[in-house]
């Protein structure tokens, strides 16, 4: 509870730019511009603490805060010499929201507050402009009804259209004062019909309604969605800015506009913006009339233009960043309504940062710190040009699981992908959900669309690793796999029809959109070189193929933190050997099948060592449950039985015996190696032989295999598997007469392993946190099923973000921190890494830096994001251990 003496309200002249937390971004910047002596209409800010109190008081404004608002209205009346509700000199205000972080379009604005039936008459006389007065009044009624009382805009738009039709005109500006006065009456009647009460005539009642509406809009669905996407906590709340109105719609010597100090699309150092004469601010943004470019203001009002250019230079120099400004001209007098760091494309962000360094305005560290790591995603993948997106209409939306843009013909199976691609077609693979068997099809598809699965489903994880566009979890699709068609947005799409996916927004289009290839600029290289200079964390990649490994190295990866061996087994040439191994009854049969696989695995590992050129490579032993590899299709079962010379019935029984109720917690990971040590022997042999072979060809490379045992929960389990690995590896190294070293470590992905990490570190030379499984087991929900209920958890503010995309620092993070401390106690030089999907999430990277991890590992296309995030973490909090 706040005490009675809390100050909830600040005049613009009482605040400054450093008070963002209290005054919000807009309020702090208005205060800062006021203190810089800029022409800012006077006003005050109701703090974010008042918003928090509003929610604490069950969505009501308590008497203490209301009293302070009234006190400050009186102060504003004294400063301006105008009065609320006065017939001779009325005070009109705008009410706008402004959170700490800029949230464009999320919160609502009300202009011309203070007008009523009497004041509008006085206003018309005072300004000698009745048309302007009634235009302002009808706008106010419309905005107040929409924003405060939640009566949709469309009803009022309809009345305007009817009026224009009746008068035989096409533009709003062609309506006369008499028409607008009549419209205001019609609007009030509409208000009465919809709400069963009169439109409020008391300006103070209007003001309290508007302030409540801004507080309430902090929790509208748009705002909640934007906050989740941008990691903005709901506890921040929004401030409210109450500001004396200035009018851009007073006639031909008035106007309003928006401008950027540099081009937000390209970063070019040139004023960019537009303005409208005789208009109010909302008109520019709403796109009702076509505005003029900012340079044309030079011809219309040269003095105002010069003053504006001067202010732009001052603001950019003061904030040391590109500014986005709103301004109004009232009877040839310029007023600044807002400035903030402008939103920009990723390419523009890099150019602006480099230019500001070259201009001596910021340091290299500041340049690295000012770029949003997530925005780099857009630079590395194809995109749809803006004009394509403006033209096309989405037919549905799923989750934006892997960025990029793709257009192709619909196919429904992985095999069909290959068939169509062989004919030279571009395809999109549409599945209920993908499985490891679809890997080849996923590899050749331009994009992947799934009905089920979240941001960390199989499809999403694999697609991000390959840099393939993916939209997952589009539950609105009615799938008919048998007949190779689906229904979405009321239309049926068949195999071979064109669709397009936008992996950055999750939008699905029922047509072919053209894509633009990603272009990496020289500025990208400069920023990345600076980032590498400042970061302490190493950045590795999760890669299972030489192609992925090379791609990651191009993006700056310093090694492989996770090479999964199972993906290599789904190749059509190998699947039968692995199936023979799984359904064998005896060790001899198993070893015979494994001996076929060993040279294949060795060749794979050699190719990966070659691609990594001596950088560290961590290879994980077989992890998935065996049932994932066995055939389910009757024809495949028959073929395998024939090949193994056993009956179909016997084989079917073996396959059924592999069925588990909860395979994710079943016979998988190191449990396979304890039951079948010959699997660990074969894989170790392939890893060591591959390393020895590449070392003999490339003596200059430092190759030191890192063998990782998955799903360990008990130190003795690891000791058992490590003995098998050591016996095999040492024998091979000795036979080769080599002095090669290797390391054995484990994945920490079971909570018990985290709690007993001191014991496990006696055996493990490194830990890699498998945060996908660690998150599942700590929360107790499966990532493949969580999508069904997580939405309700977000809506009810139980969770604010997906724990599979962004590490849960309070729970899972605590386990990670504990394991690091326990592991170091036993083995001070233990290497610590993370290889879950969260490894490419900036907030997770910062956490990993702070708890002292050695490296993070993420999919190839996220490597630049992790490099930048690691540098930002080091700039924010340098680590003592790295000095």
Predicted regions and their residues:
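Structural motif
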Residues: 241, 411, 428-430, 449, ...
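Structured functional modules or segments
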Residues: 450-453, 457-497, 501-503
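C-terminal accessory/binding modules appended to enzymatic or scaffolding proteins
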Residues: 17-19, 402-444, 812-828
């Amino acid at each position: 509870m706040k005490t009675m003496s809390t100050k909830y309200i600040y005049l613009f002249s009482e605040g400054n730019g450093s008070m963002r937390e209290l005054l919000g971004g807009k309020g702090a910047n208005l205060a800062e511009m006021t203190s810089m002596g800029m022409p800012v209409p006077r006003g005050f800010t109701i703090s974010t603490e008042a918003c928090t109190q509003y929610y604490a008081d069950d969505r009501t404004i308590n008497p203490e805060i209301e009293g302070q608002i009234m006190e400050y209205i009186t102060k504003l009346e004294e400063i301006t010499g105008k009065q609320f509700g006065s017939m001779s000199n009325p005070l009109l205000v705008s009410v706008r929201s402004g959170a700490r972080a800029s949230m464009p379009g999320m919160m609502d604005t009300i202009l011309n507050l203070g007008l009523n039936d009497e004041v509008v008459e006085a206003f018309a006389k005072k300004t000698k402009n009745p048309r302007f007065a009634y235009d302002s009044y009808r706008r106010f009624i419309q905005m107040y009804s929409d924003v405060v009382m939640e009566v949709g805009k469309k009803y009022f738009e309809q009345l305007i259209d009817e009026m224009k039709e009746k008068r035989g005109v096409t533009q709003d500006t062609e309506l006369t004062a008499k028409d607008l006065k009549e419209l205001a009456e019609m609007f009030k009647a509409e208000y009465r019909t919809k709400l069963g009460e009169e439109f409020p005539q008391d300006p103070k009642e209007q003001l309290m309604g508007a302030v409540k509406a801004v507080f309430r809009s902090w929790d509208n669905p748009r705002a909640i969605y934007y906050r989740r996407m941008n990691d903005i906590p709901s506890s921040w709340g929004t401030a409210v800015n109450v500001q004396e109105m200035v009018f851009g719609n007073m006639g031909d010597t008035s106007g309003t506009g928006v401008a950027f100090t540099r081009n937000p699309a390209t970063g070019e150092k040139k004023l960019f913006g537009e303005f409208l004469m005789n208009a109010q601010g909302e008109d520019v943004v709403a796109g009702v009339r076509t505005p003029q470019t900012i340079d044309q203001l030079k011809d219309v009002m040269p003095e105002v233009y010069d003053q504006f250019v001067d202010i732009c230079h001052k603001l950019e120099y003061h904030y040391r960043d590109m500014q986005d400004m709103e301004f109004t001209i009232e009877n040839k007098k310029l007023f600044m309504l807002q400035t903030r760091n402008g939103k920009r494309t990723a390419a523009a962000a890099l150019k602006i940062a480099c230019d500001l360094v070259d201009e001596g305005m910021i340091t290299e560290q500041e340049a690295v710190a000012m770029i949003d790591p997530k925005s780099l995603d857009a630079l590395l993948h194809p995109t749809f040009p803006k004009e394509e997106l403006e033209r096309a209409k989405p037919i549905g939306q799923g989750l934006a699981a892997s960025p990029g843009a793709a257009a192709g013909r619909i196919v429904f199976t992985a095999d069909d992908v290959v068939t169509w691609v062989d004919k030279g077609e571009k395809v999109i693979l549409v599945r209920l959900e993908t499985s490891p068997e679809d890997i080849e099809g996923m590899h050749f598809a331009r994009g992947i669309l799934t009905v089920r699965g979240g941001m960390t489903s199989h499809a999403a994880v694999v697609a991000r690793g390959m840099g393939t566009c993916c939209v997952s979890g589009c539950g609105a699709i009615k799938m008919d796999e048998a007949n190779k068609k689906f229904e979405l947005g009321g239309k049926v799409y068949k195999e071979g029809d064109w669709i397009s996916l936008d992996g950055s927004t999750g939008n699905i289009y029922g047509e072919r959109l053209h894509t633009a290839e990603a272009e990496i600029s020289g500025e990208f290289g400069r920023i990345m070189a600076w980032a590498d200079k400042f970061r302490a964390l190493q950045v590795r990649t999760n890669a299972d193929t030489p192609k992925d490994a090379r791609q990651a190295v191009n993006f700056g990866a310093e090694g492989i933190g996770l090479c999964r061996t199972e993906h290599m087994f789904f190749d059509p040439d190998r699947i039968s050997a692995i199936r023979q191994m799984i359904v064998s009854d005896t060790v001899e049969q198993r070893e015979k099948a494994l001996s076929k696989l060993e040279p294949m695995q060795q060749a794979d590992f050699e190719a990966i060592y070659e691609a990594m050129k001596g950088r560290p490579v961590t290879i994980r032993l077989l992890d998935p449950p065996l049932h994932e590899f066995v055939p389910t299709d009757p024809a495949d079962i028959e073929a395998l039985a024939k090949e193994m010379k056993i009956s179909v019935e016997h084989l079917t029984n073996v396959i059924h015996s592999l069925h588990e109720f909860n395979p994710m917690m079943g016979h998988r990971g190191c449990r396979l190696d304890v039951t079948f040590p010959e699997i660990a022997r074969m894989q170790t042999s392939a890893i060591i032989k591959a390393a020895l072979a590449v070392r003999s060809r490339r003596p200059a490379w430092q190759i030191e295999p890192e063998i990782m045992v998955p799903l360990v929960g008990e130190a003795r389990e690891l000791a058992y598997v490590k003995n098998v690995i050591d016996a095999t590896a040492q024998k091979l190294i000795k036979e080769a007469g080599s002095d090669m070293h290797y390391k054995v470590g484990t994945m920490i992905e079971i909570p018990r392993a985290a709690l007993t990490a001191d014991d496990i570190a006696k055996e493990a030379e490194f830990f890699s946190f498998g945060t996908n499984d660690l998150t599942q087991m700590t929360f107790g929900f499966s990532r493949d099923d969580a999508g069904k209920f997580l939405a309700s958890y977000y809506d009810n503010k139980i969770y604010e973000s997906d724990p599979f995309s962004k590490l849960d620092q309070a729970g899972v993070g605590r386990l990670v921190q504990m394991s690091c401390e326990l592991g170091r106690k036993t083995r001070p030089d233990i290497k610590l890494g993370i290889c879950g999907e969260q490894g490419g999430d900036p907030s997770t990277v910062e956490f990993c830096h702070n708890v002292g991890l050695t490296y993070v590992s993420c999919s190839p296309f996220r490597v630049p994001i992790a490099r930048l995030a690691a540098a930002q973490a080091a700039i924010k909090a340098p680590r003592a251990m790295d000095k």
